[in-house]
Amino acid sequence: MFAMAGLGLVDLVDDTTYRVNPVTAHMVAVPSSLDGMLHFTTEPLWSAAFLMRQLRDTKFEYPFQENKTPTQYGYKMIDEQRFVDEHTYSIMHMQGRMPSFSSFMEGKFGRFGTMPERVKSFGYDLGSVLESEANNIAIVDIGGGRGEMLLEVKQAYPHLKKEHLVLQEYRPDQKNANELTIQNWDFKDESPESVKGALVYSLTHIYHNLSDLEALRLMKKISDAMAPYSRMLIHEFAKNATYGKMHATMIQLYAGRIRSSREWKQMAALAGLEVTFEAYPVAGEGLVEMRKLGTSDGTSDVAA
C-alpha cells in the first residue's frame, strides 16, 4: 500500500492509514483501466529498456519494421527465440495476455462519450449516412474487438439490426454474436476485404498500430471494397502534444505511429481515396472520413 501511495494510486494519511483518492475512484468506476495499467507498465517498459541498445547495435536503423521493434530485440537479447520474429500482439497471445488486453479495449482508461455522440459533436452527420439504402450492410467495424462500438451505434439507431452490423476481428470473441454479425478476418494476410460496398468501414485505433507500409496495405484493401457511396471512418487520436507518449509507445511496440492531417491525405491519395471530413480534438479520438477519389466535391470539411 505504501508503494501504491508513492505511485499516487491512493493517498497516504499516516504509516498505517490510506485513503481513496480520485485515481482510486476512477479505477473502480472504469475497471478496464486496471487492465490498461497492467499493459502500459509491462510491454512499453520492456520495449523501452532495449530501445537504445537496438538503435546502437543497428547503427540507428529507423523506422523500425513491425516485427523488428525493441520488443522483439529484447527477446533476442535474452535468447527467447520463440518470440524473436513474432508480432507484439502474437507475443501477447502466446503469453496468454490477450484476454486482459481485450478487457482493456472495452473501456480503455475512460471514454469521451459514445461513438455516435462523439462524431455528432464534431458536426458529422452519421445518421444521414446510415439512412442510405444503397447497401444492406450499414457498418463494417474492422478490428473492433468485441463489438462495443457497433453496440453503441445500434443503441443510437435502433432500426439497425444484426444483419446490418458486421464485426471483423482476428479470432473474434463471440460474446455479442446475438447482436452482431461476426466474421473472422486477419487483415494482415493476403485475403481481401470480403464485404463489398458497405455504407461505412470503421476503424478505431487500428492504423496507429501499423507501420506506414502496413497501414497503406490495409487502406488499399478497404478502398478496393468500397463503392462510390462508401465511407471509411478512422477514429484515432490527434498528433499533438497530448498524445506524444502514445506516439512513442506505438513506435516501440508495433513500428506504428499517430498521424497528422497531412499524413492522412498522403496515404489516402496513394489508396485512391480522398479526405472529406476531419476533426482533431485536443483530447479523445478524432475523426477522419475518406471516400473514393472523385466521388465528393473535392473539398474537405474540417471541424472547428
Question: Residues of each region from the PLM?
Answer:
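Eukaryote-biased feature marking scaffold/signaling PDZ-domain proteins and nuclear chromatin regulators
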Residues: 5, 259, 283-285
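A short, conserved structural fragment
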Residues: 5-17
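Short, hydrophobic-biased segments on the C-terminal half of alpha helices
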Residues: 1-2, 265
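Short, cationic-aromatic polyanion-contact patches
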Residues: 14-37
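Core SAM-dependent methyltransferase catalytic element
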Residues: 272-304
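Alpha-helix C-terminal capping/helix-coil junction sites
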Residues: 5-6, 56, 269
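C-terminal alpha-helical "lid/dimerization" subdomain adjacent to the S-adenosyl-L-methionine
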Residues: 231-271, 275-279
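Conserved adenosyl
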Residues: 30-234, 238-243, 275-276, 280-281
